[in-house]
């Protein structure tokens, strides 16, 4: 049952093994701590990240934009967190709220909204190739909504990312696995399904596994695993033999 964590560790250290070699991509170099730079407009930064941004602006003889007004700020946070604009009533209430932490209250309320998981869970669902239909020319409806809802609930419940990954890769293999943990493995079942006549079922089964391997590598490592299906990867640190260890 330790295989998900062992696999992730193996790939991580394999990538780190590239450090020190000529032409190593920055993505495989461990991040280092950097002291925030000194800036001229010292009263503008509100946090260390602002100092890095301001330093670049000053080096280009540019100035920060003016602070957004309350309505613009409210619209931005609504669209960012729940994907919907505020209602006229919500705008009116926010403009009337004179508390110094009124914006923070809005952020906390939106983070607690079920819409938050729907808005941000869709990014994972897109990467996991979720769809409500099978694809191909028939594109018949499929019953996968329970996996979709699991992702939304996990996002709203702030499920730790390591557990989020483990339950999708091997939720059915966990000790005393719950129904929800088994549903999470729907991650592997998001492959397109070809129900056309004349389909070679064994070939389709193998193609489905290729799809799962490629997707798992892409969403967890940001690497194009599919290239290693036919040969050692030309750019990313993946050998063909490593690809088929996941197959």
Each model region followed by its residue ranges:
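Sec/Tat signal peptide C-region and signal peptidase I cleavage site
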Residues: 16-20
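Bacterial N-terminal signal peptides
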Residues: 5-15
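Short, structured secondary-structure elements
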Residues: 21-247
